[in-house]
A protein has these predicted regions:
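Low-complexity, intrinsically disordered extramembrane tails and loops of integral membrane proteins
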Residues: 1-44, 262-264
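Interfacial aromatic "cap" segments that immediately flank transmembrane helices
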Residues: 36-66, 103-133, 165-173, 182-234, ...
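Selective recognition of hydrophobic, aromatic-rich stretches within alpha-helical transmembrane segments
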Residues: 18-29, 72-107, 132-138, 145, ...
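A generic signature of intrinsically disordered, low-complexity regions enriched in glycine/proline
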Residues: 8, 16, 100, 161, ...
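A broad, structure-centric signal for solvent-exposed, well-ordered loop/edge residues
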Residues: 13, 151, 201-202
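Intrinsically disordered, low-complexity segments enriched in small/polar residues
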Residues: 4, 220, 251-254
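Membrane-interfacial helix-loop-helix connectors in multipass membrane proteins
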Residues: 144-167
Length: 264
């Protein structure tokens, strides 16, 4: 295996499943873990970051540079979201390699481009369409009900109109949030299930949704810890995000291993 950190991923990355005794028994829809595990995912993510902190930061900077280059080029910028998702999934593959004792490399950013990229792109499209549908469901009823108010502003008290608009905006936000949560739950583990377990898009999203739903309490604690870490990361001129973003990626992987595997 080449030790050059800039070398493209070799065959060891393409063979992403690589079952071993360390994996434990895979549970297709996941299993319930203790509530405190939500905090432990961050601790285990920190261990993965500590295994190669310099390479994590270098890879993250390379991610931002590549994404920016794609985003500013006309026509190609349409695909920026797909490129970002594929590179992010590549970093999840890198987490798996780190877990197994292999080095993290900048080349991991391109690992998912060779590992079922078609399914991953479909996953992004499906998630995007579901998000648009959720927005339409949230906006349309209130948007239609607001038309008489907007066209009859001269006949309505300004304070009453403002209050009605604010209430409508709040309700739209809450409805969209309620509809978005299951969408993101369905997406959360789907990339890993696609590249690591060879799942189809629909099956991966359904299993991810079930796994997140049955572990709502651990995820609640996970989110609270993440909120605290985000606040801390903002203090030193946002430089803490150079550590926090890799930890977020790694925490998705550690949660995946915790929920979908039972150690023998």
């Amino acid at each position: 295996m080449s030790q050059n950190p800039y070398a493209p991923p070799g065959a060891d990355i393409e063979d992403v499943r690589r079952p071993s005794d360390e994996d434990g028994r895979f549970i297709e829809s996941g299993h319930v873990v203790a509530a405190g595990r939500g905090a432990s995912w961050w601790g285990e993510a920190w261990s993965l970051f500590k295994a190669a902190p310099g390479m994590w930061i270098l890879t993250l900077l390379a991610f931002f540079v590549l994404y920016a280059l794609v985003a500013i080029i006309p026509v190609l910028n349409f695909f920026a979201g797909f490129v970002a998702m594929l590179m992010g999934t590549g970093l999840l593959i890198g987490c798996d390699d780190l877990h197994r004792g292999d080095p993290l490399r900048v080349g991991h950013l391109f690992a998912a481009f060779k590992t079922r990229p078609g399914r991953l792109i479909v996953l992004v499209v499906v998630t995007g369409l579901l998000s648009i549908l959720a927005m339409l469901v949230a906006v349309l009823p209130f948007g239609l009900s607001m038309l008489p108010i907007l066209f009859g502003m001269e006949d309505m008290d300004t304070s009453l109109m403002t209050g009605t608009l604010l209430v409508s905006i709040l309700l739209i936000f809450l409805i969209f949030l309620a509809l978005s949560i299951p969408i993101y739950m369905a997406y959360w583990f789907a990339p890993l299930l696609i590249v690591k377990q060879d799942f189809g898009v629909g099956k991966a999203m359904l299993c991810s949704l079930k796994a997140c739903a049955m572990n709502f309490v651990p995820f609640l604690l996970y989110g609270l810890v993440g909120l605290v870490l985000t606040i801390v990361a903002m203090i030193p001129l946002f430089l803490g995000f150079l550590i926090l973003i890799p930890m977020i990626i790694a925490s998705i992987y550690t949660a995946y291993r915790d929920i979908f595997f039972i150690q023998r």
